[in-house]
């Protein structure tokens, strides 16, 4: 749990869809583990893959931590958890025409689900 003001959570929708602003949302984590992206200047950047449900469809989104605090929180995420976040979103299209979504996460909250509790033996 973050020690910062989490008044942004009031904007979270209860049906799993995007909130009042594209920077606030909720994603589920189907697979645990941090992946690393390589930036254009050669640095490695940690990221977590989540599933964003919106308008009856599911989209994969990469969650990229804004700072070390958020990065540490992401390392504790288990398969089946739900992440509520606030951040800056963006999308890009690759050469094949596929659209990729990413969010630079400024603050987040991890909601443990029954599946993640059972995986950890709790």
State where each predicted segment sits.
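OB-fold and OB-like single-stranded nucleic-acid-recognition modules
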Residues: 1-122
